[in-house]
UniProtKB/Swiss-Prot annotation:
Catalytic activities: L-glutamate + acetyl-CoA = N-acetyl-L-glutamate + CoA + H(+)
Lineage: Eukaryota, Fungi, Dikarya, Ascomycota, Pezizomycotina
Transit peptide keyword on record: yes
Domain (N-acetyltransferase): residue spans on this chain: 537-706
Annotated localization: Mitochondrion
Compositional bias of kind Polar residues: 497-508
The protein's enzyme class: transferase
EC number: 2.3.1.1
Stretches for region Disordered: 99-119, 487-508
Annotated Gene Ontology cellular component terms: mitochondrial matrix
Swiss-Prot/TrEMBL keywords: Acyltransferase, Amino-acid biosynthesis, Mitochondrion, Transferase, Transit peptide
Name this protein carries in UniProt: Amino-acid acetyltransferase, mitochondrial
Organism this protein belongs to: Neosartorya fischeri (strain ATCC 1020 / DSM 3700 / CBS 544.65 / FGSC A1164 / JCM 1740 / NRRL 181 / WB 181) (Aspergillus fischerianus)
């Protein structure tokens, strides 16, 4: 069996056990292991697992019982990380798409050859598939040599990777390191192999930082080896650098990096580069190492030859990009997610880089400049209403470093607070630079190792019972299964729900994890920052304006609603009352908003008429291929309620519309319209207290006529 065979990695796979044992015997002689490898396989490590039973009861269990407990813990972790069956099915569909069948597999086979048994690809479900080893290895009466399968000519299977940066692991205790190692092991079992860069920080001399990086890399490697069916390697001499020309380091050998990853090893790297002229070890910033790895794994590191045919260059780069898919860039930092100073939540749940990067960077820069001023004035005065209203003070006091009492602490807190904001700036910038080099499907996660480790802790229930409190969702596994953040970015703080700590006390759910996408540009017509959307705005935008691609807009609506639009009738209805248009990306999602008047109120442009106008969401559409993932709906909804109509908007939906649950969670109120099939939603504060406005909202939602071309009798 070739050591490059990509079997699914599970505890119950007997073939994997044979493969692993053969791999261990050849590790020291295999051609893919250069001298620079420092493998923990040479160390005697007790294979163990961290699950809910005590060590004594675990030792009394037999081998099969131990395997069942390990699988039980693994699958419980997965089930707790996926919110719905739809998310689990979506992950399985994406996983299946990663391993497409070759055209020859669909052809009938005239004769099956006796070959080595194959295992199903994708998420392995223990021994649910296939026969046992005794069946595979039973003797067969056959005279003459056994037939062999023809050599495979299929290309190398694409390797799906997560690039992880673990910051200052020397400050983390063993429980946190073990929790991180367990999560990395589970990601590996789910088909996402991890390459980890250990970041020792910047405090200390270069020689000390190099030693710390090596020690912490070995520490993490040992923790990963302790996980069931897990392998790790500390790989040295990965980076090279030209000392005469400052810049990013380069990956010395792509093959030496990818080979152990293809074997299922979690590869651990230190940010140490070696000069090209005279070999000398130089500590480089971990972020530079991450960007160098991203560039290499994205197939962009090769320098094009000016004499080479451009088509040949493009083909060569394309082959490199087909070898590897860098799906996730994960930044594990004790600071956690990117803080949100201008919003009610403590951190940004989701960042659409194309739209929000500049604003969030400026927000952090302004917060950094505010820290020294707040430090000298607020600490001496003690707690005050000013401090309570200052978003920077609230963040640094509650999230970064609690401020002790006493005058001796006044000068000691400014530096940590400023350093924390600079750390967030670095995390934001490295995520943006990395995602710029990757496909739009790739994403980034910025979270703390504490959150990852706490969600990886075993269930407190007995190993003999599956009944217990739902465990905290692991942000990394949840994101792999759903391609979404733990919490929706468009969900109001009041709707993010409580959580119980098991002792009767209920706490609000807050996320310190930031999900990052390269994302898509967002277009708002007219721009609400220069032309606010008000009833008095004249002249109004029209959908047949040259700045709007009407055919693509119509396709977006028809694809989302799965109905044919009567375009001319729709234009006649909305053109004279259009408030604005929101478009996400290349018409992947959008919203059409209008100013509507209740029946009987004349639109004469008077102040009384404008006061009765209702902000109305006429169409909210997302392409089918973008529904449920990518955050398109959240991007459009956030733009609507935060930028375009911050004072409120209303809309209607069929009472049996499956999207209503999503609407319920994001609206401030709902009202079922009697004698109709409609439910009215609104985000306007205190609407029910204004009886006239409420009646106007209801009248608009009752009277608006649809403009569908297919008269099926089904409303909207």
């Amino acid at each position: 069996m070739s050591p490059h065979t990509g079997w699914p990695r599970t505890v119950n796979s007997s073939l994997l056990k044979k493969h692993r044992s053969s791999l261990c015997t050849c590790q020291h002689t295999s051609s893919f292991l250069p001298r620079s490898f420092s493998t923990t396989a040479d160390r005697h490590v007790q294979q163990s697992a961290d699950f809910s039973s005590t060590s004594r009861s675990y030792d009394r269990l037999g081998r099969r019982a131990k395997e069942k407990l390990l699988d039980r813990e693994f699958f419980l972790s997965l089930l707790s990380s996926a919110s719905t069956k739809r998310e689990a099915k979506s992950y399985l569909a994406r996983l299946k798409a990663q391993y497409p069948k070759s055209p020859d597999e669909n052809k009938p086979e005239p004769e099956k050859l006796a070959t080595a048994p194959t295992l199903p690809s994708g998420v392995n479900l223990g021994s649910f598939y296939g026969a046992s080893r005794s069946v595979y290895e039973s003797p067969v009466f056959r005279q003459g040599p056994s037939p062999t399968a023809p050599p495979s000519l299929e290309p190398v299977e694409r390797l799906h990777l997560a690039l992880v940066r673990l910051s200052t692991p020397q400050s983390l205790d063993d429980n946190i390191i073990d929790g991180v190692a367990k999560t990395l092991s589970q990601l590996n079992r789910l088909g996402l192999t991890c390459c980890v860069v250990v970041d020792p920080g910047t405090e200390g001399v270069a020689s000390t930082l190099r030693q710390v990086a090596i020690e912490q890399a070995d520490r993490l490697a040992v923790a990963i080896q302790k996980q069931p069916d897990s392998k790790s390697l500390r790989l040295d001499s990965v980076f090279s650098i030209d000392a005469s020309r400052p810049g990013l380091p380069q990956v010395s050998s792509r093959k030496a990096l990818l080979n152990p990853l293809r074997h299922g090893h979690t590869v651990i790297l230190t940010p140490i580069a070696y000069t090209e002229d005279v070999p000398r070890a130089i500590i480089v910033p971990a972020n530079d190492a991450v960007l160098a790895l991203t560039k290499e794994l994205a197939g962009l590191a090769s320098t094009p030859d000016p004499d080479e045919d451009p088509m040949v260059t493009a083909e060569r780069i394309g082959r490199l990009q087909k070898e590897v898919s860098l799906d996730r860039v994960i930044l594990l930092d004790s600071l956690g997610g990117i803080p949100a100073f201008n919003r009610r939540q403590t951190s940004h749940v989701f960042i659409n880089m194309e739209q929000e990067y500049d604003d969030i960077e400026n927000e952090l820069l302004q917060a950094r400049e505010m820290v020294p001023a707040t430090e000298t004035s607020l600490l001496k005065a003690g707690p005050s209403s000013i401090a309570d209203n200052n978003p920077v003070s609230k963040f640094v006091n509650a999230e970064v470093v609690p401020v002790p009492s006493g005058p001796t602490q006044e000068l000691k807190t400014a530096a940590p607070q400023r350093s924390a904001i600079e750390g967030h700036l670095e995390n934001l910038r490295v995520a943006q630079k990395a995602l710029t080099m990757l496909p739009a499907a790739s994403s980034g996660i910025i979270t703390s190792p504490f959150e990852v480790a706490s969600s990886a802790q075993p269930s407190p229930t007995s190993e003999f019972s599956a009944v217990g409190t739902r465990r905290q969702r692991n942000p990394l596994i949840h994101n792999l299964l759903t391609d979404k953040p733990l919490l929706s970015s468009s969900l109001p703080m009041s709707r993010r729900g409580p959580t119980n700590n098991g002792q009767g006390t209920v706490y609000p759910v807050t996320s310190h994890t930031t999900f990052v996408k390269r994302g898509m540009p967002l277009t708002m017509l007219p721009n609400p920052w220069t032309e606010p959307w008000t009833p008095q705005s004249r002249p109004r935008l029209k959908l047949d304006d040259p700045s709007i691609d009407l055919p693509r807009l119509v396709h977006l609506i028809e694809d989302s609603f799965d109905r044919k639009l009567d375009v001319q009738d729709y234009l006649n209805r909305v053109n004279d009352r259009l408030a604005g248009l929101i478009i996400a990306g290349e018409y992947e999602g959008g919203a059409i908003l209008t100013w509507e008047l209740p029946p009987g109120v004349e639109d004469d442009g008077s102040e009384a008429s404008n006061a009765r106008m209702v902000p109305y969401l006429d169409k909210f559409a997302v392409l089918k291929r973008s529904q449920g993932a990518g955050g398109v709906a959240d991007i459009v909804f956030n733009a609507m309620v935060r930028s375009c109509f911050p004072n409120g908007v209303c809309w209607r939906s069929r009472k049996n519309n499956p999207v209503n649950k999503w609407y319920f969670e994001r609206s401030l109120g709902t009202w079922k319209l009697s004698d109709t099939n409609w439910t009215m939603f609104w985000t306007t504060p205190s609407l029910v207290e204004d009886s006239q406005k409420f009646r106007d909202y209801e009248a608009v939602c009752r009277s608006t006529q649809p403009s569908w071309a297919d008269d099926t009798g089904v409303v909207d």
